[in-house]
């Protein structure tokens, strides 16, 4: 089981779709060697060094957290049903209401659209909020994603810079 890494006062909570088998096996988020999450958040400015999956708890030192929409591990995220994503979206709203980070970054358009019953999502900041928490949709850093490392870093950096401008 991959546990959430959450606390009050976070700048951002990154929300993956569900754990892959590597993460489920190790208990660490974004654990597959091909997953680019740790490299991306470092290069985008969220951390001052590239953390390893087993150092995930150190995200809190940078006022970052991690959660997921669905607990069930799968080989590929497309194995998660619309119903699971929708139910996960309701649970996620409760978590975010409890912790109220500055931003919630949903990693993937499908996750956002199906988890929050939205259509036609664009990358970046959304108009929908959860209380005072901004919602952002960012490309998924999975190794299965065709988005280049450069584009991932650019998208994540936009969020990091927006939070700096917001004074957080």
Swiss-Prot record:
Database matches in Gene3D superfamilies: Uracil-DNA glycosylase-like domain
- InterPro entries, alphabetically? MUG/TDG, MUG_bact, Uracil-DNA_glycosylase-like, Uracil-DNA_glycosylase-like_sf
One molecular function GO term is: pyrimidine-specific mismatch base pair DNA N-glycosylase activity
Acetylation keyword on record: no
What's its catalytic activity? Specifically hydrolyzes mismatched double-stranded DNA and polynucleotides, releasing free uracil
Tell me where on the tree of life, at the top rank, the source sits: Bacteria
| EC number of this enzyme | 3.2.2.28
Q: Where is this protein localized, as stated in its record?
A: Cytoplasm
Keywords carried by this UniProt record: Cytoplasm, DNA damage, DNA excision, DNA repair, DNA-binding, Hydrolase
- Annotated Gene Ontology cellular component terms: cytoplasm
Task: Give the UniProt record's GO annotations in the biological process aspect.
Answer: base-excision repair, AP site formation
Query: Main site of residence?
Result: cytoplasm
- Quaternary structure and interacting proteins, as annotated: Binds DNA as a monomer.
Q: Which NCBIfam families match?
A: PRK10201.1
Described by its record, this protein's role is as follows: Excises ethenocytosine and uracil, which can arise by alkylation or deamination of cytosine, respectively, from the corresponding mispairs with guanine in ds-DNA. It is capable of hydrolyzing the carbon-nitrogen bond between the sugar-phosphate backbone of the DNA and the mispaired base. The complementary strand guanine functions in substrate recognition. Required for DNA damage lesion repair in stationary-phase cells.
Of which family is this protein a member?
Belongs to the uracil-DNA glycosylase (UDG) superfamily. TDG/mug family.
Q: What is this protein called?
A: G/U mismatch-specific DNA glycosylase
Gene name linked to the record: mug
């Amino acid at each position: 089981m991959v546990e959430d890494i959450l606390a009050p006062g976070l700048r951002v909570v990154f929300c993956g779709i569900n754990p892959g088998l590597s993460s489920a096996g190790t208990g660490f988020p974004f654990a597959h060697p091909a997953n680019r999450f740790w490299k991306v958040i470092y290069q985008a400015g969220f951390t001052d060094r590239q953390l390893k999956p087993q150092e995930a708890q150190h995200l809190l030192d940078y006022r970052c957290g991690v959660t997921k929409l669905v607990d069930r591990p799968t080989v590929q995220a497309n194995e998660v049903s619309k119903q699971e994503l929708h139910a996960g979206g309701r649970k996620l709203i409760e978590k975010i209401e409890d912790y109220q980070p500055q931003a919630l970054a949903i990693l993937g358009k499908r996750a956002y659209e199906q988890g929050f019953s939205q259509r036609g999502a664009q990358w970046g900041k959304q108009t929908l909020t959860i209380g005072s928490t901004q919602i952002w949709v960012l490309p998924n850093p999975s190794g299965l994603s065709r988005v280049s490392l450069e584009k991932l870093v650019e998208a994540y950096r936009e969020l990091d810079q927006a939070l700096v401008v917001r004074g957080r």
